Every structure is written in structure tokens, then in C-alpha cells.
A protein has these predicted regions:
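Alpha-helical bundle regulatory/interaction domains
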Residues: 1-52, 59-61, 65, 88-104, ...
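Short alpha-helical segment immediately N-terminal to, or the first helix within
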Residues: 32-33, 80-84
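Residues in the recognition helix of alpha-helical DNA-binding motifs
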Residues: 57, 69, 81, 106, ...
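Generic hydrophobic, amphipathic alpha-helix propensity
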Residues: 70-71, 75
């Protein structure tokens, strides 16, 4: 039995709609327009499908659960915010609707380091890159 191409197109449409709504919601969280994180059922309601159907469809279309994309994007946003030294880690946590200790647990679970360790290693890496660039500029060619 051949599965109609229309079925696969709809799967990808649902997945794309979810990712679009996810990005919009996370932008709203970061900007402060929204103060509570959505759950899968909230996204399902926005795109007019049942939560179980949304989860199954995204898993089938992408190989990953909706939570995978949510956590991946949340980690990207967290890392970006942590790269700004003027934002305290506790403020990053609260902006992303976490209390600081739960944010640390979340971040460490997905990155293998605490937010503080990530921030320190990020700036250490930047300093090393800057030093390498300076060293390259100072080297004089023997020819």
C-alpha cells in the first residue's frame, strides 16, 4: 500500500508550523511579552491539532520529539544571553522563566557545564583567540 504524498506534506507542514510558533513564543519570552512557557498542548492548540497528534507527527517527520527542539532552542538562547557579561546568570534564568537553581540544572544537563562554567570558558576562548590574532600580527616574516 502506497502512502499518499499529501500525508507527508501535511506532516512537514505541521512540523514547520510548530517550529515557527516555538520561535515566536521564545522571542516573546526573551522580550518579556510572555512570562510563562508553553507546553506541547499550547502549541497544539495554536496550530489546531491534538497534542498527541502534534507529538507523533513531529517525531515522524523529524525523528525528534517536540521537546528536543524546544530544549535545543532554549539552550541556544541561554548560551547567547550568557555571552553577555552585563546580564547576571540569575537574570538569564528568570528571563527564561526558571529559578536560578533549576536553570543551572537544566543548563548543565544539556551542556555538561554550569552556566558560570560556560560563561567562563566562552570568555577564556575569546581571550585565547584574541591573543592568537595578536601573536599573528606581531610575527615578522623571515623573508
Amino acid at each position: 500500500m502506497k502512502i499518499p504524498q499529501k500525508f507527508f506534506a501535511r506532516q512537514h507542514e505541521i512540523a514547520a508550523d510548530y517550529l515557527k510558533e516555538l520561535d515566536k513564543h521564545l522571542d516573546d519570552i526573551v522580550s518579556g511579552r510572555v512570562t510563562e512557557m508553553f507546553e506541547v498542548r499550547d502549541f497544539a492548540e495554536l496550530i489546531h491539532v491534538h497534542p498527541t497528534h502534534l507529538s507523533n507527527t513531529i517525531k515522524s517527520a523529524t525523528g525528534h520529539s517536540p521537546c528536543y527542539f524546544f530544549e535545543e532552542r532554549l539552550m541556544d538562547i541561554s548560551k547567547s544571553m550568557l555571552q553577555n557579561m552585563s546580564i547576571p546568570i540569575s537574570e538569564v534564568a528568570r528571563t527564561l522563566t526558571y529559578d536560578p537553581s533549576n536553570f543551572t540544572k537544566f543548563f548543565k544537563h544539556f551542556s555538561g557545564q554550569t552556566p558560570k562554567q560556560y560563561r567562563e570558558s566562552y570568555f577564556l576562548g575569546l581571550n585565547n583567540e584574541t591573543q592568537l590574532e595578536t601573536d599573528k600580527k606581531l610575527k615578522v616574516s623571515p623573508f
